[in-house]
A protein has these predicted regions:
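Conserved PLP-enzyme active-site core in the AAT-like
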Residues: 1-99, 112, 122, 129
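Conserved C-terminal alpha-helix-loop-beta "cap" of PLP-dependent enzymes
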Residues: 51, 88-167
Length: 167
């Protein structure tokens, strides 16, 4: 089952973070999960200072309950099939309209290729970020830049690091 695959997959990890607003199917929250008791103990100090006690992390009971249901539902075949098909449909429509997108499509998002979409914007003017902002201003489309800004500057030279992909 999908749940068994997910459980085994995460059994091999040391830890993970999750924004529950996306794949947890809730309106707020997130979590950190760790397989190392020593790191967990260190992390709890910061959790208490900034988020709330370790048993609820600043979330109320309703939101924690909704997150539990959302995580369960997000591993159901019908939900995943529908979501993946919706993403694929959107991607195919964009390709049909000539929009440069990264392929193959996944199940989480469609990534526009800013290097091909807006090649006239110089890289040092953050073309992927500019594209994301304009899509929001013009169409209300909420996205995020995965490119030069996310790559951050070189810690020693303080110069931009330009990744191959600007999405």
């Amino acid at each position: 089952s999908i749940k068994e695959i997910v459980k085994e997959f995460f059994s091999y990890t040391d830890g993970m973070t999750m924004s529950a607003k996306k794949d947890g199917l809730v309106n707020m929250g997130g979590f950190i999960a760790l397989n190392n008791a020593e790191i967990y103990k260190k992390a709890t100090v910061y959790n208490i200072m900034f988020e709330g006690f370790i048993t609820y992390g600043g979330l109320n009971g309703r939101d924690m309950g909704a997150l539990a249901v959302g995580l369960d539902e997000a591993t159901e075949f019908d939900y995943l099939e529908t979501r993946i098909n919706q993403v694929a449909y959107l991607g195919a429509q964009l390709v049909e309209f000539g929009v440069p997108v990264q392929q193959p499509f996944g199940g989480h998002a469609i990534f526009l290729d800013a290097n091909k979409f807006v090649p006239t914007i110089p890289r040092n003017e953050y073309r992927a970020q500019a594209l994301a902002i304009e899509l929001y201003i013009i169409g209300g489309i909420r996205g995020v830049e995965i490119g030069t800004i996310l790559a951050d500057r070189d810690p020693f030279t303080h110069k931009n690091r330009y990744p191959e992909l600007e999405l």
